[in-house]
Amino acid sequence: MPPAEVFLSHASEDSPMPQNLATTLTRHGVPVFFSPINITGAQQWQNEILGALQRCDWFVVILSPNAINSMWVKREVAYALQDRRYEDRIVPLKYIDCPLESLQWLTLFQIINFAADFKSGCRELLRVWGIGLREELLP
């Protein structure tokens, strides 16, 4: 079943991959909260992020060295792990190889590998929701 809305947790330094993923999901009919798009000028971004975490029904985190060192990614992951709505609805994506041993919570989840191939990663992620990849919708 497709999600109502996906929270996309990422490190801003990892652009353009998070942007490309948000675009791909949106083009496949999956609503995404992606802070660079959904938070506009004059908004209090901390409140917007908290509101999105409370509203979304799936949590996708893009793992990279930047992400595992990001205070905000750590906070977002901690929130998702404690919120029962996200039980069985947290999807970690490995974008860039990084030391995952420090992330004890990861042992609970199957990681989707985006490090080798963006298209294959998108195919596997969309399959989680029963959606087939349409290559013409890739950025």
PLM feature spans:
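Conserved TIR/SEFIR loop-to-helix hotspot centered on a Trp-containing motif
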Residues: P65-R84
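A short helix->loop->beta-strand "cap" motif at the edges of active sites that frequently abuts
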Residues: R84-V91
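An anion/phosphate-binding loop that grips the pyrophosphate of nucleotide cofactors and donors
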Residues: C56
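Short acidic active-site motifs
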Residues: Q44-I49
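C-terminal interaction surface of TIR/SEFIR-family domains
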Residues: M1-H28, V91-P139
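Conserved RecA-like helicase motor-core motifs
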Residues: G29-I39
